[in-house]
């Protein structure tokens, strides 16, 4: 497989030698006009043409791996550092940009990738059914507390956001404790996991659950009205809570 750089907009970014050529090929799972504007400014400043191949992360990764050494990808932008594993052996190393190093804290970069954005994975609650006392001192770990039995919704465990959350909990608490924690989480679920992050927020708004775990980005997206008036109205019925703040 061709050596590529890996970018996750939640956590990754890096340059290859292609940036010293006349064009650079970016495989991107992002879909924002602001990115296009950045590419245009980059081309205007450097004279380097930016070719963007857009798609969902899974499809882009499949294409890159199938094309192997023939892949044209120079940079890959995706949604989570957890996706790094699929390309670990094929990433371009040697990131040497002093500008990047000064702008990005060391815990959000390596020699092969660097973060360009972050999203918080937090708890959403129904204010009419969840009291302030219940939320006091809430942590990700305490979501396994039996008091939340039948009240929690979260998307499936094969979701990369959940996998990264669990990885961080294992790092901080150890595999044994988080194995027990995961069983408690399952016991507390109001329903079998289904749907995306917005579906979890919708479930709380509809009274199917009292709390949900989802990324902050999705509440803002729903509140913006871009996903329709129904989701906008639902988003106004829930409140965000940031765990592990003590």
Stretches found by the model and what they are:
Residues 1-8:
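Bacterial N-terminal signal peptides that target proteins for export
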Residues 15-21:
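Sec/Tat signal peptide C-region and signal peptidase I cleavage site
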Residues 21-86:
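Early extracytoplasmic/lumenal segment of secretory-pathway proteins
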Residues 22, 48-49, 71-74, 148-151, ...:
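Loop/turn elements at helix/coil->beta-strand transitions in domains of secreted/extracellular proteins
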Residues 25, 122-124, 239:
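Residues embedded in well-ordered beta-strands
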Residues 29, 33, 59, 72-208, ...:
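Extracytoplasmic ligand-binding site segments that recognize negatively charged/polar headgroups
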Residues 46, 95, 176-177, 229-234:
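Short helix-capping segments at alpha-helix termini
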Residues 194-202, 206-209, 229-246:
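Extracytoplasmic/periplasmic substrate-recognition and gating elements
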């Amino acid at each position: 497989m061709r050596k590529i750089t890996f970018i996750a907009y939640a956590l990754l970014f890096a340059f290859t030698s292609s940036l010293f050529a006349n064009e650079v090929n970016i495989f991107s799972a992002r879909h924002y006009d602001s990115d296009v504007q950045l590419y245009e400014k980059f081309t205007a400043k450097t004279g380097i043409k930016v070719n963007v191949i857009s798609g969902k992360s899974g499809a882009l990764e499949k294409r890159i791996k199938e094309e192997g050494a023939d892949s044209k990808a120079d940079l890959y932008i995706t949604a989570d550092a957890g996706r790094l594993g699929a390309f670990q052996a094929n990433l371009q190393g040697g990131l040497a940009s002093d500008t990047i190093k000064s702008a990005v804290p060391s815990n959000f970069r390596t020699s092969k990738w660097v973060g360009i954005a972050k999203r918080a994975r937090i708890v959403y609650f129904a204010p009419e059914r969840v009291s302030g006392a219940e939320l006091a001192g809430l942590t990700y770990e305490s979501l396994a507390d039996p008091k939340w039995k039948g009240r929690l919704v979260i998307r499936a465990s094969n979701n990369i956001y959940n996998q990264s959350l669990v990885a961080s909990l294992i790092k901080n608490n150890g595999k044994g404790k988080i194995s027990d924690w995961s069983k408690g989480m399952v016991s507390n679920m109001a329903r079998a996991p289904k749907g995306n992050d917005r579906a979890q927020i919708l479930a709380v708004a509809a009274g199917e659950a009292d709390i949900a775990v989802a990324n902050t980005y999705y509440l803002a997206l729903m509140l913006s009205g871009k996903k329709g008036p129904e989701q906008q109205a639902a988003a106004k019925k829930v409140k965000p809570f940031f765990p592990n703040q003590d």
